[in-house]
């Protein structure tokens, strides 16, 4: 026998639903998005650290502020509003899942380790971040640019991320 583990998300329904025969043969588990930002940050930082060790990346563990920023961006875009609730946002067509946040940071860590100074910087995160948000080159690009100009640009401690993301465009 063998085990098969696969993942999907609720927003990617595809053309056809899973057939009744397959539903009987597979155990499906639906995991909700983490309830709090702190819970999501904890999951992301733990998984990124595990992956970095497994890949034996010669980079330092990501600074918590980079993890926090990526998670905050994902949560704000996913929820359609800023953390403080003052600004309504358009949401991209992608899922903006916790798994994608982990992927963005893992990619940034690999870039920092092999092409940078071994420390995760905004420039290492920017390319993967833009790629995670912009799935549809028309609709999502507008959502991303609006978020970049109205939210990221206005946060004084995010100037480096704003510049790095603008350079990717």
Regions inferred by a protein language model and the residue ranges of each:
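Context-gated lysine
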Residues: 13, 23, 46, 86-90, ...
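Generic structural signal for short, flexible, solvent-exposed coil/loop and linker residues
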Residues: 4-7, 11, 15-20, 59, ...
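Canonical AAA+ ATPase core
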Residues: 1-56, 109-111
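Residues that form generic nucleotide/phosphate-binding pockets
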Residues: 25, 43, 47, 69, ...
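Generic hydrophobic/packing signal
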Residues: 6-7, 21-24, 74, 95-96, ...
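Conserved AAA+ ATPase small/helical "lid" subdomain
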Residues: 41, 48-124
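C-terminal engagement/docking regions of AAA+ P-loop ATPases
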Residues: 113-169
